[in-house]
Design a protein with these regions (language model features):
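Surface-exposed, short loops/turns at beta-strand junctions within beta-sandwich domains
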Residues: 12-13, 131-138
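Short helix-loop boundary/capping segments
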Residues: 63-115
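Short nucleic-acid-contacting surface segments enriched for D/E, G, S/T with interspersed K/R
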Residues: 5-21
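Surface-exposed edge beta-strand/loop patches
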Residues: 138-170
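Extracytoplasmic beta-rich ectodomain segments of secreted or membrane-anchored proteins
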Residues: 42-75
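Aromatic sugar-binding surface patches on proteins
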Residues: 117-129
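OB-fold/S1-family single-stranded nucleic acid-binding modules
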Residues: 24-49, 160-162
Length: 170
């Protein structure tokens, strides 16, 4: 239980939110020093209205990326001026999920014309549990993740591959 929350934050009862926190475990419970909500975009197909009329190819730098507890987690560096208006999403292609057991994901980032002056961090946690088969819920799934990054050429794409096993905590 939380014994002391120094953040002044409120999360409504009976709600669920993915957060990053700095805390200390104490005998009477956790003492929370900082708390930040994470972006948790649910993967959607490229023809979803959320991606309409925008390319979403604005670059990011991946600081760290890892699988954990049915999520693909990442820390990103963005170059920003105001940092306002940035939109993130995950474009999925699961056309090979049934045949090869793989899902392709592309990070959608629309900076909304924000100029690139300063570095700012973004924390994203992509839910993956929806890819687990109901008949074989622990079968592994290959996640192919791509994103646009900074480079001399426009449209520089980097990629990662992960073997996701639903329910695995590591």
């Amino acid at each position: 239980p939380v014994s002391q929350d120094l953040t002044g934050s409120t999360i409504s009862p009976n709600t669920s939110r993915r957060v990053m926190s700095n805390y200390e475990t104490m005998e009477e419970g956790a003492k929370i020093y900082s708390l930040q909500s994470l972006l948790t975009p649910t993967p959607k197909p490229k023809d979803d209205p959320a991606f309409k009329d925008k390319e979403g190819k604005d670059p990011v730098e991946v600081v760290s990326i890892w699988l954990g507890r049915d999520y693909l987690n990442m820390i990103l560096n963005l170059k920003v001026s105001t940092g306002k208006g940035h939109t993130f999403g995950i474009i999925e292609d699961k056309s090979e999920l049934e045949t090869t057991g793989s899902v392709d994901m592309l990070l959608y980032h629309d900076a909304d014309s924000d100029e690139e002056y300063y570095n700012r961090r973004a924390y994203i946690s992509v839910p993956l549990k929806q890819y687990a088969e109901s008949e074989h819920p622990t079968d592994g799934i290959k996640i192919k993740f791509r994103y646009y990054t900074y480079g001399k050429e426009a449209d520089v794409i980097e990629d990662y591959e992960f073997e996701y096993t639903p329910g695995k905590t590591e």
